[in-house]
Each structure stands twice: as structure tokens, then as C-alpha cells.
Amino acid sequence: SMSFRKDGNYLELTADSLDELFSKENTKLCIFIHGLACTEWWWSSYAEKEYGDPRLNYGQLLEKDLGYTSIYLRYNSGLHISKNGASFTKLLDELVKASPREIEEITIIGHSMGGLVARSACYYGEQEDHSWVKKLKRVFCLGAPHFGAPLEKVGNFLTNALHSINTPG
């Protein structure tokens, strides 16, 4: 099931847990979203390759350099993007409501399918008038196939072609 993660652990959306997450000085939140068939660990493996430290991830670098609180979204990439987007917008709304501190700004960074899930969540969040949308300052989509992935296009073409063939049933 979809959840937020921090340092590899499930993040409970309770006032106590979120009070530990945010420092008194820092209420800027960055959410990293992985791509297809990955988990939040994807962000660590690339930081390790680039910076040579196996304990390092991009969230930690963002916290150190720009003062953000970073968390990671884990979701089932086998589900449809719209279903994940709708679930993400509700989960983010729960986080904002449960936080004992006012979250002043939100940034979302999505890789590949994660960028599409982020975009879908923004759509549903706006449609449903969630309060977190007003706090959203940036969405970065890294390698997100906004116009369709080549494999998905081929799959759709083949599906339509096969449906047009009259087969005895």
C-alpha cells in the first residue's frame, strides 16, 4: 500500500511522528517519488554512485544544502497512474492535516512514472480543493514520459490491432 518513508522506515502520519520529522526552524517539505518497478531506495543508489557514500541519498543532500525536510513516497507502480495520483493526493492531505507545525512549502520530485503520479496528484488535489495544493511551490519531473512511453505506445497499438481482427469465438 502507498506510504511515506523516511530513512527506510514507514512514516506514521501522527502529530508525534511528524513533530520529530520537522525541526522548529524547518517546515519546507520535499517529497521524492520513484519510477516504475522501483522503491524509494532508487534515490539512494544514484546518490551513492555520484558521491561515493553508501549511506547518502538525495534527500539528505537537499536537507543539508537547502534546509528541506525530505521524505519518500512508496507506491505500487503496477496500479494505474490515476489511481496512484488519487491516493497520493489523499495521503498528502492527511500528512498536512496531521502535522503539528504549519508546512510552509512543498516541493515534489518525481522520476519517470513518479513524475506522472505527481502530476496526477496535483490534478486531483486541485479538483478536490485540498489545502496542500496552495503550499505546493515546485514539481520536478525527471525523465517523465508526459506524452507516453515508447513501450506503452507500442502496447496500445498492438492491443488495438488485435481487437480489430475478427477471431472465431
Residue ranges: model-predicted function:
Residues 1-73, 83, 90, 101, ...:
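Flexible, membrane-associating and regulatory peripheral segments of lipid-active enzymes
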Residues 34-37, 73, 80-169:
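Serine-dependent carboxylesterase/thioesterase catalytic core
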